[in-house]
Amino acid sequence: GWRYDASSPGDFQIWPTKKNGIWDFPLEMLPYENGKYQGLSMDFNFLYNQSDGETKGDPAKYPLWQQQTVDSYMAGFNRAYYGSRAPLFIGNHFEDWNGGIYMKAIDQVIKNVCTKKGVKCVSFKELADWMDVQKPETLQALRGLDPAQSPDWSSVVK
């Protein structure tokens, strides 16, 4: 049967929970434009905010838009990496929108993030497998953390 659902409309950057026995891996609200607001962690949301949904926006703005996308993904990653350590979920349509800048942004983020100490870049299946073997009380404690909250880990993970 189904073990996870990655189609949720979005939520804050917190540890996943199960809904009706299925892991919910939603898109996440990430800092956008240096934290002016939060935007969903999906290429279409950047496209909508940057070029009003036009898939072939102004090419002169591609470098800026790509950097904004990288910065948003990295801000979300860093918030959790130095905080709650919640997983980062990124949605992508594998399209060539705005000159392929969203795919290029993900390539940059992967090269930066997946090499960091203590980070594992995994599939949803691998994450579900790992989540399934964690102690329920540990997951509950993790879910209670603010994304940027770096706890006393000895009190959370026992």
PLM regions: where:
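Active-site-adjacent pocket scaffolds in enzyme catalytic domains
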Residues: 1-81, 135-146
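C-terminal domain-boundary segment and adjacent tail
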Residues: 4-15, 71-158
